[in-house]
């Protein structure tokens, strides 16, 4: 007499098929977030920094109008998705403390490379989008009134 797989085993197999794509989607969105917005230890924070980082991170196939780099640890940024952040608007979180950032603003007229950027630096609250506890979208930063 052949034994058929039990319902629990089938649920387990279904979990193997469904869960990995979800995790890999979160991972790729988090990786993209890090590529676009994370630089823990910047070397300089002037216009040349912006221009070299935008090229290094491959953000200049068309000149991006604005991009912000966050200078802190991955864990501190991720913590905004939890206790170090507060709900803000729809599906966003605002940091409870300031983060050191450099914002790169395109200063050319053409959207085509070579791209030239103006750097502005400071300590700001940041607003990010999170999925499953991971930062996946940078929304904005501002200095509190």
UniProtKB/Swiss-Prot annotation:
Site (Critical for catalytic activity): 64
Keyword set includes Secreted: yes
Tissue expression notes: Expressed (at protein level) in macrophages.
GO biological process: angiotensin-activated signaling pathway; cardiac muscle hypertrophy; cell growth involved in cardiac muscle cell development; cellular response to glucose stimulus; gene expression; renal absorption
Organism: Mus musculus
UniProt binding sites for Zn(2+): 65, 106, 137
UniProt name for this protein: Angiogenin-2
Cleaved signal peptide residues: 1-24
Record comment: activity regulation: Divalent metal ions, such as Cu2+ and Zn2+, may inhibit the ribonucleolytic activity.
UniProt KW keywords: Cytoplasmic vesicle, Disulfide bond, DNA-binding, Endonuclease, Hydrolase, Metal-binding, Nuclease, Nucleus, Secreted, Signal, Zinc
Family as reported in the entry's similarity comment: Belongs to the pancreatic ribonuclease family.
GO cellular component, one term: cytoplasmic vesicle
Domain of life: Eukaryota
A GO term for molecular function: metal ion binding
Residue interval(s) of motif Nucleolar localization signal: 55-59
Disulfide topology: 50-104, 63-115, 81-130
Subcellular location field: Cytoplasmic vesicle, Secretory vesicle lumen; Secreted; Nucleus, Nucleolus
Catalytic residues in the record: 37, 137
